[in-house]
Amino acid sequence: MATQKQDEFLLETEQTRTKPPPLYKVLLLNDDFTPMDFVIVVLQKFFGMDRERATRVMLQVHREGMGVCGVFPKDVAATKVEQVVAFARQHQHPLACVMEEN
């Protein structure tokens, strides 16, 4: 009798566990107008990258058309996209930043 209650408790515990929220990649997209140095500043300011890593990501964006800035929960990713786009517009650059499910 005790094992049946333990089994029911374990079953309930397993059913109530939630899976972690999906993560989203934040991507920068290449354009022909935004200066490379500005992209490096964005990567350092909003994604906490050191200059070397920011330069590598910037070159990936330049050569491959896009680069991953980081992977975050949905709300954090959306905030970062908004911040980057607003900062770029404030400095009159057309830099595009998007997010996609990881």
From Swiss-Prot:
According to the record, the segments passing through the membrane are none
Residue span of the signal peptide, if any? none
A GO biological process of this protein is:
proteolysis
Q: Which domain of life is it from?
A: Bacteria
- Subunit: Binds to the N-terminal domain of the chaperone ClpA.
PANTHER family reported for this sequence: ATP-DEPENDENT CLP PROTEASE ADAPTER PROTEIN CLPS, ATP-DEPENDENT CLP PROTEASE ADAPTER PROTEIN CLPS1, CHLOROPLASTIC
Q: What does this protein do?
A: Involved in the modulation of the specificity of the ClpAP-mediated ATP-dependent protein degradation.
Instruction: Tell me which family the UniProt entry assigns to this protein.
Output: Belongs to the ClpS family.
NCBIfam families in UniProt: PRK00033.1-5 (NF000672)
- Name of the protein: ATP-dependent Clp protease adapter protein ClpS
Q: What is the organism field in this record?
A: Aromatoleum aromaticum (strain DSM 19018 / LMG 30748 / EbN1)
Report which gene this protein is encoded by: clpS
